[in-house]
Amino acid sequence: MKKTAIAIAVALAGFATVAQAAPKDNTWYAGGKLGWSQFHDTGWYNSNLNNNGPTHESQLGAGAFGGYQVNPYLGFEMGYDWLGRMPYKGVKVNGAFSSQAVQLTAKLGYPITDDLDIYTRLGGMVWRADSSNSIAGDNHDTGVSPVFAGGVEWAMTRDIATRLEYQWVNNIGDAGTVGVRPDNGMLSVGVSYRFGQEDNAPVVAPAPAPAPEVTTKTFTLKSDVLFNFNKATLKPEGQQALDQLYTQLSNMDPKDGSAVVLGYTDRIGSEQYNQKLSEKRAQSVVDYLVAKGIPANKISARGMGESDPVTGNTCDNVKARAALIDCLAPDRRVAIEVKGYKDVVTQPQA
C-alpha cells in the first residue's frame, strides 16, 4: 500500500510546475520504451506453500505506445507492455511467472521549459498473467487493473522526443489461478516520433487592391465660338466644336464618370444678367451633349456668371466698348469638367 501511495504521488507531481515539449495540438505520435521491471508481493499463495528459493523479481521490461495530443496539456495514449518473466528457483515452487498487458491512459502534462514537460498518465490496464511451476503446472489469468505513471519528456528535436517514466500497476493475476498476485513497477526510457510537427507556411495576405484614382479633366471652349455675343443659342460652328468634344468624352469612358458644364461671362452688363446668361449657355451645351448620347444623369449645368475672370486687370484701361468686348473675350467661355475613377492595374510580383 505504501508503494502504491508513492507511485501515485510521483504521478501527481506532474502538475507541480510552465512552455511546451508536448506535440502540436491534434497530432499523433508513436514510440517504444525499455526499462527495469520489478515485481512486488511475490509470495506463492497456492496450496498454502511458500516459495523457499530465490525469486528473480527484477526483470527487463519493454513496450510500445501510440498517442493523440489534444492540446498542450492533454493527450490520450494506448500501449503494449511486456512486464517481464520472473523465475522461481525454490525446492517446493520451481517455475516462472510472466505478464503482458495493453493499457489505455489519459496523459496530463505541464511545461517546465520550452522543450521539457512533466506529466502523469492515469488509466486502466488489461493484463494477462501466465505461470508455470512444479506444483500447479501451467495456468493463466486475465484481468483489469488501474495504472499510474509519471515522468518527464524532453523534445530532442522537432519530431523526436525521449521520456523517463515510472509506472505502477496493482494486483496482476489471481492467486487462486496462477499462484501469485504481484504488483509491478517499471522504470523505463522511451523514444517517440511525433507526426505532423511541420510548421505551416505562413499565409501571406494578398495586397489590397489599390484604390482607384480619381481623374479630372477640363475642356475649355470659347463662348465666341459657341454663341453670338450676348446670346445663348449654339452657332453651327459651336455645334461642330461640341461634336469633336463629344468624341473625346466618349473615348475617355471613365468609371462612374460625370461631367459638369460651367458657363462664364465677362463683366459687361449687370451681375444678375450675366449670371442668368451663363446658366442658359451652360444648359444649352448640356442639352446638345445629351442629345448626342451622354446620359442625362451624368451631366449637369452650372452658371458661374462673372466669377473667375482670366483676363485679370489687363482690360482696365480699355474704354471703347468694341475694344473692351474683344479684350474680355477670354472671360466668355464654357468649361466642361469630367470626373471619374480610373482602375489602377498593378503588375503581379515574380
UniProtKB/Swiss-Prot annotation:
InterPro entries: Bact_OuterMem_StrucFunc (IPR050330), OMP/PagP_b-brl (IPR011250), OMP_bac (IPR006664), OmpA (IPR002368), OmpA-like (IPR006665), OMPA-like_CS (IPR006690), OmpA-like_sf (IPR036737), OmpA-like_TM_dom (IPR000498). Its main location: membrane. Disulfide bonds join 315-327. It comes from the Bacteria. The chain crosses the membrane at residues 27-37, 59-70, 74-82, 100-111, 116-124, 146-155, 160-167, 186-194. Monomer and homodimer. It is found in: Cell outer membrane. The extracellular loops are most variable in sequence, and in some bacteria confer sensitivity to phage and/or colicins. It comes from Klebsiella aerogenes (Enterobacter aerogenes). It holds the Pfam family OmpA_membrane. With TolR probably plays a role in maintaining the position of the peptidoglycan cell wall in the periplasm. Acts as a porin with low permeability that allows slow penetration of small solutes; an internal gate slows down solute passage. Required for conjugation with F-type plasmids; probably serves as the mating receptor on recipient cells. GO terms for cellular component: cell outer membrane; pore complex. GO terms for biological process: monoatomic ion transmembrane transport. Coiled coil: none annotated. Residues 214-342 form the OmpA-like domain. This is Outer membrane protein A. Sequence repeats lie at residues 205-206, 207-208, 209-210, 211-212. Residues 205-212 are annotated as: 4 X 2 AA tandem repeats of A-P. Keywords: Cell outer membrane, Conjugation, Disulfide bond, Ion transport, Membrane, Porin, Repeat, Signal, Transmembrane, Transmembrane beta strand, Transport. It is a multi-pass membrane protein. Belongs to the outer membrane OOP (TC 1.B.6) superfamily. OmpA family. The record marks 77, 163 as: Part of salt bridge gating mechanism. Residues 1-21 form the signal peptide. One of its GO terms (molecular function) is porin activity.
